[in-house]
Design a protein with these regions (language model features):
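Conserved end of the kinase activation segment
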Residues: 180-192
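Catalytic-loop of the protein kinase fold
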Residues: 125-144
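ATP-binding glycine-rich loop module of kinase domains
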Residues: 8-47
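Activation segment/activation loop of eukaryotic-type protein kinase catalytic domains
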Residues: 139-175
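Conserved short submotifs of the Hanks-type protein kinase catalytic core
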Residues: 75-89
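Short beta-strand micro-motifs within the conserved protein kinase catalytic domain, predominantly
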Residues: 65-78
């Protein structure tokens, strides 16, 4: 697996769809939870992610599309197969390209990457105005060097928090907007400004290294 926590594993493998290509296999083991409400909530979150990806993949080629998904009731797990994104996470990219002092070229590349993040979210917002990612962070952004264009390309993954109509302190510390932290289990209006805040935090980290 390329990612593991208490309930979720994400595998990177290959599937055959006329040809071999990379795929992410996301497995949510809801059977490990004793609380029925928590179990149903996790399943609903993953279903929301599948539904969201179906819509978002029509808006941009820079997000993964869902190939297949099912509820494996025998093993008490929910499985989603989606296209893998090329490259490495922005977190891994930043670790590899860490500099004590950024040069003009480093700043230019980072600026271009941030612009691409904004453009992807803009394209999604134009076609799907109600969607807010809610968990933009370096781990959910992939960077790949395109050998044909000689440029770095950006991809965005993990829309599992999008389309949730309530705030449950979702998101990741250091990238959450104030409105994500202030109210818990209360219906509120979240806009794309929440994602803009996260992008600002990401840009700050890319330029200052913290």
């Amino acid at each position: 697996p390329v990612y593991v926590n208490e309930t979720t594993k994400i595998w990177c493998g290959k599937i055959s769809d006329g040809e071999f290509k990379g795929a992410f296999v996301k497995i949510l083991n809801y059977g490990e939870l004793d609380d029925k409400a928590a179990k149903n909530e996790l399943k609903n979150v993953l279903r929301e992610e599948v539904n969201t990806l179906k819509q978002v993949s029509k808006c941009s080629k820079r997000v993964p599309s869902v190939k297949d998904y099912w509820d494996d009731t025998r093993e008490s797990r929910y499985v989603v197969i989606m296209d893998t994104m090329p490259g490495v996470s922005l977190r891994a990219w930043l670790d590899k390209h860490q500099r004590d002092e950024l040069q003009a070229k480093d700043i230019f590349i980072r600026k271009c990457l941030v612009i691409q993040i904004c453009e992807i979210m803009r394209d999604i917002s134009n076609k799907y105005p109600v969607l807010v990612h809610r968990d933009l962070k370096p781990e959910n952004i992939f960077v790949n060097f395109n050998k044909e264009t000689k440029k770095w390309d950006i991809y965005i993954i993990d829309f599992g928090c999008a389309n949730l109509n309530y705030i449950r302190n979702i998101g990741t510390t250091n990238y959450q907007a104030p409105e994500q932290l202030g109210i818990r289990n209360t219906r509120v209006s979240i806009t794309n400004k929440t994602d803009i805040f996260a992008i600002g935090q990401i840009m700050y980290e890319m330029l200052l290294g913290r």
